[in-house]
Structures are given as C-alpha cells and as structure tokens.
Amino acid sequence: MLRKATKDDKKVLEGLGEFIESLELDILNEVSKEIFYDILTYIFESEEDRFSHKYCTVYEKNGEILGFLFSYHYDNLDEMKDFWFNNARSKFGLSDNSIIFDYDEMLEGEYYLDTLYVFSESREKGVGNKLLEDFTKSSYPLLSLNVAQSNYRARKLYESFNFKKECEVFIGHENYDHMVIRK
C-alpha cells in the first residue's frame, strides 16, 4: 500500500543513505558516516528539507517499507534551500560549499521526482512501478525527473510512463537526462 511517510519511517533513511553513498558525493568525504546519518535523520524529521518526511511517499506491504520516493514542487525550492543553507549546514558545522545535491536539478513550474528507491530484496516486484504510477497521477501539469545516462533500465521504465527527454543536467559526478511529462 502507498502512504505518506511519517517521521517514524526510519527505514527510508537506510535506503536514502545507501543511494547517496552509491553516488560518491563530496559531502561523504567531509563527514563521518555516523554524522552523515545524523544529518539525514535531522533533515528527514524536518518539515522544510527536500528529504523531509513531508515530501516522501512509501510503499509498504505487511508493515514493511519496500520502497519510497521523494517529490516536491519547484515553488518549495526556496524554502528547502533556506533550510539547508541557514539551518542544517550550520547545525552540523559544514562548510559553506557543503550540499548533498545541488538545487538546480529541476526547472521552474515542475513537480519533481527527486529520488525513487526500491530496497534490493523488493526489486523486480513492481514496487517501483507502483510508486511511479502514483507520482504520474499527480494533478500538476508538468512532472519531471532525472535519470543517469548510464541507467538504461530506469530510463526504459520512465519512458514506459511517457516521460520524454527534455535536456541534460550534471548531478554529482555524472550526466543525467532531464525527463518530463506535460499533461
């Protein structure tokens, strides 16, 4: 079943942390793994960050979270940036350049799927499809996401939901295709 996440859904942090670690982002060189997970917990429990429980949808079966996604509208971006740069970063003593991801991954007016993650033991069971289907049912007229150019499998999934490549962006250390659905 799909539902909005709560602050108590700490399993999301395991998947989010694993995903971010796989991207080898610069912030991982700045803080210990323990501090990194403290940061993730802090921002997940917040109401303002892009990785807040408020922007998270989970897919759950028999009380276990099998996957999740984070999505939000462009109009929330200033609040998210403000929270990171003026709150989270100072709380953890991070440098002025410290970020998890840059904030230029989306374009004005978009409802953006930031992260879709399915736990390894639940892959190939339709969990990603259910999460993506829920996202595409949004009433927003412009939906977007980014997919690594090397991730052919994910691209195929997104194309099956009628996402089309709009442009290219550079995130972390890799090139991504910015894909959209215009309703």
Describe the predicted segments one by one.
Residues M1-L16, D26-E30:
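A short beta-loop-alpha structural element at the N-terminal edge
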Residues S22-F44, R89-G93:
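Conserved GNAT-fold acetyl-CoA-binding loop/helix
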Residues E34-C56, K61:
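Active-site rim helix/loop that mediates acceptor-substrate recognition in acyltransferases
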Residues V58, E64-H73, Y112, Y117:
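Conserved beta-strand in the GNAT
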Residues H73-Y111, T115:
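Conserved acyl-donor/pantetheine-binding loop and adjacent beta-alpha core of acyl/acetyltransferases
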Residues G109-Y111, L132, S138-Q149:
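Conserved GNAT acetyl-CoA-binding A-motif
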Residues S122, G126-D134:
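Conserved acetyl-CoA pyrophosphate-binding loop and the N-cap/start of the following alpha-helix
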Residues P141-R155, F161, C167-K183:
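C-terminal "cap" of GNAT-fold acetyltransferases
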